[in-house]
Amino acid sequence: LNQKTHDFLATLAPLALSGIGEGVAAIVGSDLEAAVERLLPALPPAARLVIVDQTADGAQACRRFVQTDLRLGVINETPAQFIEDMVEQRFDALLVMPGCEGDEQALVSLLWQGGFMALHPDLKAPSVDPDELLSWDTGRGVALRMLPPKPRRRGGRRRNQPRQAAA
């Protein structure tokens, strides 16, 4: 692992995983075995992690984790195939690693509201609507947070406002 990857896996990636409770996270990229090994201690006990490795060797190497940890699953697909397959699925956290070049923008669509995406510093940050996503560059990668929808005002009398006297 290079220094950038090391820093990302020590800071932003575990932060993305730590808050998901019983949710589902995905790590997407190539040759992910070393990264997954570093991140497993940060995965909450009731959470699940989908490992999406587009290299056959990387996916095979990650399968050894699945034998001992039932929270994990491995998919051997490219990021584009994964996005297509996951049309109905949303994730609480996405860890986007090298191997996803060109798919960064499309992966945003897989986040739940409130979901957290951690983007490796070698990748291009997606352009986002600030009303829908918070985005900040930490220097060790980019963090994206999907915002909940704005509350809609419903009709009816506003509380704390005096009624107009009936004429």
Language-model-detected regions and their locations in the chain:
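Conserved alpha-helix/loop element of class I SAM-dependent methyltransferases that forms part
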Residues: N2-V24, A34-R38
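A short acidic, Gly/Pro-enriched loop at the edge of an enzyme's catalytic core
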Residues: I83-L94
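A short glycine-rich, Lys/Arg-flanked "PGG" loop and its adjoining helix->strand segment in the class I
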Residues: D103-F116
